Design a protein with these regions (language model features):
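Short, low-complexity N-terminal regulatory "tails/caps" that precede and couple sensory modules
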Residues: 1-5
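Short alpha-helical interdomain "coupling" segment at the junction between an upstream regulatory sensor module
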Residues: 167-185
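Basic, Lys/Arg-enriched C-terminal extension of HTH/homeodomain DNA-binding domains
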Residues: 191-200, 239-268
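Pre-recognition alpha-helix immediately N-terminal to the DNA-recognition helix
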Residues: 208-209, 252
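Recognition helix of helix-turn-helix DNA-binding domains
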Residues: 217-252
Length: 268
């Protein structure tokens, strides 16, 4: 990429603001910085179900599970969704930099993420309002067979705020279909209700919180740091959780809870 090529693509993207062509010009601009195999722009609104605004791909298999699985509830375990919930996130985030320490061991990673053939993913975050975040996620999948290199990641980070600003300006008037809906209850509360209705298992708020930490890929040490309690206390929470659910392993916890996730988004 030369400076003149980048400047030309940036000028094209600026001229395309507030037109339907912006996503394509945005894509061309990003490709000057880092070649990618797929791009998807997603709008997150609070804890409601997210909306896909744009997608492009080399191999369609990468988005085959998107509508049924990701939007059907798997997004609740996505590290990028968790970043959105932090609020006011701008700039570049690499998935593996924000994912929990045991992310690759999770049901989400093994049964959803690997199915997409994604090898690496970087997101441009743009905070539109207090509750709405846009992410432009660019990925490398089996089409290229390799992750982003150091030079590409450096280029993306260098222009991260420019890319965020383009997204924010273009979608500044974006209104989610959920804007008139009441905010859903916290996901821990929804999980407790679904588990009680489906299996007559009554978790305490803390047990539900720990269960979700485990599903997202947090180790016991990571959970202790997030909750501000000792590692031994987390181990006690896990034993209580497993006993109440009549299970003895993390795999059984995934098998019990993952089918409930579609129910958690019914009112999202």
């Amino acid at each position: 990429m030369t400076h003149s090529e980048h400047d030309e693509e940036l000028a094209n993207a600026i001229m395309a603001l507030a037109t339907p062509e912006l996503p394509q010009y945005f894509s061309s601009l990003v490709k000057c910085l880092a070649a990618f195999d797929n791009l998807i722009i997603i709008a997150y609104h609070g804890e409601h179900r997210p909306a896909v605004l744009y997608r492009e791909y080399t191999d369609p298999v990468v988005y085959l599970p998107m509508d049924s699985q990701y939007l059907g509830g798997a997004y609740l375990l996505d590290p990028f969704y968790r970043e959105h919930l932090r609020g006011s996130v701008q700039g570049i985030r690499r998935l593996m930099d924000v994912a929990p320490d045991h992310f690759r061991r999770t049901h989400y990673y093994k049964n959803y993420y690997q199915q997409t053939t994604l090898l690496d993913e970087v997101a441009v975050f743009a905070s539109i309002t207090e509750s709405v975040t846009l992410t432009a996620c660019l990925g490398r999948d089996c089409s290229s067979g390799k992750p982003f290199n150091k030079r590409e990641l450096q280029a993306l980070r260098q222009y991260g705020m420019t890319l965020s600003s383009l997204l924010k300006k273009h979608w500044q008037d974006y209104r989610s279909d959920n804007v008139m809906k009441a905010a859903p209850a916290p996901v821990e509360e929804r999980l407790r209700e679904a588990l009680n209705q489906q299996h007559s298992i009554r978790l305490s708020p803390r047990q539900a919180e720990v269960a979700l930490f485990i599903l997202r890929g947090h180790s016991s040490l990571s959970i202790s740091l997030h909750l501000g309690v000792s590692l031994q206390t987390v181990k006690v929470f896990r034993r209580q959780l497993y006993a109440k659910c009549c299970i003895s392993s993390q795999a059984e916890l995934f098998a019990l809870l993952m089918p409930l996730f579609a129910r958690l988004t019914e009112h999202g």
